[in-house]
Curated annotation (Swiss-Prot):
Its EC number is 3.4.13.21. InterPro entries: Class_I_gatase-like (IPR029062), Peptidase_S51 (IPR005320), Peptidase_S51_dipeptidase-E (IPR023172). GO terms for biological process: proteolysis. The keyword Protease applies. Belongs to the peptidase S51 family. Hydrolyzes dipeptides containing N-terminal aspartate residues. May play a role in allowing the cell to use peptide aspartate to spare carbon otherwise required for the synthesis of the aspartate family of amino acids. The keyword Cytoplasm applies. PANTHER family: ALPHA-ASPARTYL DIPEPTIDASE, PROTEASE S51 ALPHA-ASPARTYL DIPEPTIDASE. It is an enzyme of class 3 (hydrolase). The gene is pepE. Keywords: Cytoplasm, Dipeptidase, Hydrolase, Protease, Serine protease. It is found in: Cytoplasm. This is Peptidase E.
Amino acid sequence: MELLLLSNSTLPGKAWLEHALPLMANQLNGRRSAVFIPFAGVTQTWDEYTDKTAEVLTPLGINVTGIHRIAAPLEAIEKSEIIIVGGGNTFQLLKESRERGLLAPIADRVKRGALYIGWSAGANLACPTIRTTNDMPIVDPNGFDALGLFPLQINPHFTNALPEGHKGETREQRIRELLVVAPELTVIGLPEGNWIQVSNGQAVLGGPNTTWVFKAGEEAVALEAGHRF
C-alpha cells in the first residue's frame, strides 16, 4: 500500500499544503487521476474545498474531482489512481463516507494500488478507528470504525502544551484515558509539520518535530524523523 498521512495542512509562513507538495510528488509514480473526499469540510462548502484542493495540486499534474460531484462514486473510486481525504471534522467525514457506502471501496482500492493522501481528519480516517481525533462530535457517525489502512491510531496536531492558567487535560492525559478503556491500542502523537509515509509495507516517520508513541502501562516513547514502524 501507498499512504501519505499528514498531521496538518498548513505551517506558519507557508501556503496551504505547501510543505506537503514535495512529499506528494515523490509518491505519485505516474499517478494523475484523483478523487477528493471533501466531507470533513463544515465551514466551507464541499465545492469550495474541492476547488481549493484542485488548484493547489495542479502544479503536480493531478486531476482532482470531488466525489460529491460524481454520479457514480463507487465506479470513480474503482478507477481512481489517487484518493485524497481532506481535513476538517472527522465525525462528519466518517458519517458521510459510511452513509454513502465509500469506506470498503476506498480501502479495497488503496490495497490494490491507489495512493491514499490524507491530512488531519483524513489521516484519522486511515486508522482502525477515529477514536484519537481532536474534533468535536458534531454528528453521530454510527460507530467509530474507519478504514483500517494504517494499523496504529494517529492523534494529529499533537501537542502537550497548555495555555498558562488552563486547567483542562493535556493531550497525553486524554490519550491515556483512551488507553485505559482500550489498552490494546497504540497511539502516535503526530505533531504539526510531521507525517507518515507508507510504501511497500514500510511506514516511515518524517518531519522536523518529535513524535510520541503511547501504549497502555508504558512511558511515552519519543521518535524522530526516519523512524520505521
